[in-house]
């Protein structure tokens, strides 16, 4: 069995977990999340713990570990939430909020407008910082990757949109 799946997920106080066949719903102070679990995994809720185990063979053990990690992310999301920080590096690179949109000026001839999906909130503490937050870890990461994808950091000058904790490997320019 997967080492990850062996550890049960603890349900903190104030979190309600409902299991309906292969659909699990987690409700907490920050909202609720629903996910369909793979049919190769059996999920049991008992004694303020969620336990995942593979249904058949060793081939499905990886699915049990994945399901356990996804459920843990749901529990953490509805209690604490997730935050992803982006930094804009470059002359004239700016970000500002306009309702549910982020207006990005990234050196193109036109400004880019990125629409935020439901469940993701954004803040701009400064013109060169974007802070994304929400309950769904996958959705936060997806939105952050889309914004970074507009202008990924380039290795020569380091300009572009990067994650706050990202280290960009720099290259030396060609010499004559």
Swiss-Prot record:
Gene Ontology terms: biological process: cytoplasmic translation
Biased segments, Basic and acidic residues type: 151-170
Keywords: Ribonucleoprotein, Ribosomal protein, RNA-binding, rRNA-binding
Disulphide-bonded residues: none
GO cellular component: cytosolic large ribosomal subunit
Region listing for Disordered, in residue ranges: 151-176
Pfam family, one: Ribosomal_L6
Keyword tRNA processing set for record: no
Record carries keyword Plastid: no
Source superkingdom: Bacteria
UniProt cross-references to InterPro entries, sorted A to Z: Ribosomal_uL6-like, Ribosomal_uL6-like_a/b-dom_sf, Ribosomal_uL6_a/b-dom, Ribosomal_uL6_bac-type, Ribosomal_uL6_CS
Single annotated GO MF: structural constituent of ribosome
PROSITE patterns on file: RIBOSOMAL_L6_1
Quaternary state and interactors: Part of the 50S ribosomal subunit.
Family label: Belongs to the universal ribosomal protein uL6 family.
Role noted for this protein: This protein binds to the 23S rRNA, and is important in its secondary structure. It is located near the subunit interface in the base of the L7/L12 stalk, and near the tRNA binding site of the peptidyltransferase center.
HAMAP family membership: Ribosomal_uL6_B
Name this polypeptide is given: Large ribosomal subunit protein uL6
Origin species: Shewanella halifaxensis (strain HAW-EB4)
